[in-house]
Amino acid sequence: MACTAMVSTNAFAKEEVKAPAPLLPLPEQKQVDWQRMETYAFIHFGLNSFCDREWGYGDTDPKMFNPKRLDCEQWVKTLIAAGMKGVILTAKHHDGFCLWPFEGNDYNVSKSPWRNGKGNVVKELSEACKKHGLKFAVYLSPWDRSRADYGSPSYVDYFHSQLRDLLTNYGPVFEVWFDGANGGDGYYGGARDKRTIDRKNYYNYPRIYQILDSLQPQAVVFSDGGPGCRWVGNEKGFAGETNWAFIPKNTVYPGYPNYPELQFGYPDGDQWTAAECDVSIRPGWFYHPEEDDKVKSPEQLADLYYRSVGHNATLLLNFPVDRNGLINPVDSANAVNFHKLIQRELGNNLVAGMKPKVSNERGGQFAAQALTDGSWDTYWATSDGVTSADITFTFKKAQKMNRIMLQEYIPLGQRVKKFAVEWLDKNGTWKAVEQGEETTTIGYKRLLRFLTVETKGLRVRILDSRGPICMNNIGVYYGGEDAQLTWSPASVAIKSVPFSLKGFDEAQLTKVVDRNPATVLFADKNELLIDLGRDTKVSTLMYLPDQSENRHGLIHSYTLAACKADGTDEHVLSSGEFSNIQNNPVLQTITFEPATTRYLKLKADRMVNDGEQIGVAELGVK
């Protein structure tokens, strides 16, 4: 009888359902863990914070660094309250100044008056992170404008030794950040010249990756081409609505010239390298007092969250620490309120625990219930060969909703190529929700904002996929009647005294004073002659560059002078460079000692792109 019973039980046993085959390329587990962090912070801090620069030249005296109230615990507590899961510190920016007492040079915090030369910002922040449970990471600029040997093989050895020092003495890091800005003019030990390097090969990245794998194997490596995660191709904080986590292997590298492509990824790429969206809470990356009233609002930050994390990327939000060594209270308040806003809009999942109706189900553990159980590790999947399917939710009574969250189970690859979201009207007709984005890729997470509907039915239609569909979570939310579809920037308002431009008529002049950054005036030479109408006491010139994706006419370095009506007999008021203007084309402000003049000449000593003439979206003098 026992034998008979055993045979009977086996006869009715369910056949095990196999999981869908992985679809290459695939992420490593550390890449999955990194993307699940979603939001984390950047800290830009250094000598630049004290000399009002974005890119230091490499010649600033270390004695200028003296943040008398520096408190890394204040940073960490602020970031945690703002929902950040980690923080990346600029241990060394392009100027070469080190925020830790690196023994390989004399250009570091030990040569500053801060903490009587005994301080170590990297150590203090890493210890504060450990104490409060925030993940820690480091930014190390490959470019070094202070070093005489930059461009030679000996500098590469020096750079590698800095990396080893950071990765050995300050605990585990979740990411190592390599900037794509490499080579150009600089102090270079007093040479004050321009250095050009082979961005792809000079630093010996294969050797760098070996160092990282041996010292911090869990760390994700950031650069334009990863390999752990990639730059999104802009510094505005958003990814493309279509965004693949793939790039072509051995093609994209730090300083990659076709970087605008990176915001979309490559559907035929063979390396998993998801995008990271870096953006500052202020216009600049380092602290500038004049930007205290230009901090992004909670609504602006929320919009960036939807367009970064909600576009299959992560959000890296920069906080410029001020000259006291603290995160400014306005920055702190806006970031915390941004986190509260996201929690409010996405806090109540209307379909949690519901079992949706699906048009296809693989069966076994890959059932539709996995879509709403709140677990990352369970997922719904379709049968082999099924690359489109409908997911339908039915409510007992009508529900208001205006947000949806979709997630693919990315350990098996990114698959969905096209989808749609529909609601059931009172007449029983399915209609597309009203929203402004293309509904193509999903990836780790897709967030869609749409006009509020009140309905008893919601349907997600997966219209095309690279293989069997694998989705692990769906969330539906009502963000409130005041929840925005998107955030639109206000017009650019520049307070200015009246002026005209020599050689340009009224219609052309309008382009630089119309508060519309989309209209751009292009000069026919490399200078602008500004006529104030009469002798006027002025001390500031404001210049907004071309804001388009393929922007032109960007000034790299400039000379501003008072002059005669014909542009001669110059008295130089200011000269310098607009650092990082290509990637972060924010309003550029030139301040100088007050001068009384009728005419000003702004001359481009060097353009970002050789051969181009000056382009101006907005201009002002005061």
Task: For the regions a language model picked out, list residue spans one by one.
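Aromatic, loop-rich ligand-recognition surfaces of beta-strand-rich domains
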Residues: V330, N337, I342-N348, D373-E434, ...
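Mature catalytic domains of secreted/periplasmic carbohydrate-active enzymes
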Residues: K14-T387, T392-F393, M405-Q414, A432-F450, ...
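Bacterial Sec-dependent N-terminal signal peptides
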Residues: M1-E15
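Intrinsic disorder/low-complexity signature
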Residues: V7, K357, A370, I469-C470, ...
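Structured N-terminal alpha/beta-domain signature
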Residues: S500-L521
